[in-house]
Amino acid sequence: MITFYSPGAPGVQLESGTSCAELTAPAVWIDLFQPTTDEEKALEAALGINIPTREEMQEIELSSRLYKEGDSLYMTGIMVTNASSDNPTSSAVTFIVMPNRLVTLRYAEPQPFVSFRSQRQAHPEFYRNGHDVLAGLLDAIIDRVADILESVGGSLDRISLRIFDAEAPDGGSNWDRQPQKGKSGRRRRQRQGDFVDILRRIGCTSDLVSRARESLVSFARVVAYYREMQHENPAAREALVHLKTVAGDLGSLSDHATFMSGKISFLLEATLGMINNEQNGIIKIVSVAAVVFLPPTLVASVYGMNFEVMPELKWVAGYPFALILMVISAVLPYAIFKRKGWL
């Protein structure tokens, strides 16, 4: 699908029977969304440029993402899509800056494009040429990444509360701070289930932050390349002034994303430490059982050998004596270990 945007006019889609050249002439922004081969050929003929293939857009070499052909600049950035879901994705978007218009090529519907279309419809007088459109799109993209990082920050705060069993903002608690008697087993099972969910959420958050950082890095290069190539172009003067601010925002957001990556690493290590602590508690229970039952088992084994010469076998109080000895051998080691603080 190809949509043509002329100054101060709504978008017009290319339909069968419509001349692509007629729609191209007044347009300052041409948006290609999942174009067909015929649409690409028609636009290439009308503009006299080469439209990159989807495979070429995915190439990671810098020379494949930022280059110049004739009077046109080709710049490809990575955008985060489906950021609100548990399965965010990344999609390449190519910006072709021509002397009098902007061509965008994409195979996804990122939120910034939706936001920018609404912004353009509300203030059409701000976007009189392709450079202004590019500046507006980049501004919308940065705003979206900032929103994603803000959302991630809130998610990390909630994850931190769950990990460290802190008081929730609403006055409640994710886990009982003081386990009630007789409910430690159920509480442990609840915590184990929570840890599994926490690990999953940390993984999803880490993936989203990684994609956001990739997007920020790619658009930092796009902005730097555009400013370098257009610094002497009078038509791009206003866009260059605005993109100077955008470049600063990109740097600050990249620093914030780096901070969040460090926080994610800390929370992951803390979660694994909590899981290890829970496992140590289980091992401790097994150790207590071994300390308590091993001595009585030894006593029972001695008196269960059934040798003929065993005085206790003919002793009337032999059986009670053995039982009392087994109880003492169980209680005494437990009391000693407890006093020493080993249990």
What are these model-predicted stretches?
Residues 1-229, 234-236, 245, 249-259, ...:
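Peripheral, non-transmembrane regulatory/ligand-interaction domains of membrane transport proteins
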Residues 248-343:
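Hydrophobic alpha-helical transmembrane segments and their immediately adjacent juxtamembrane loops
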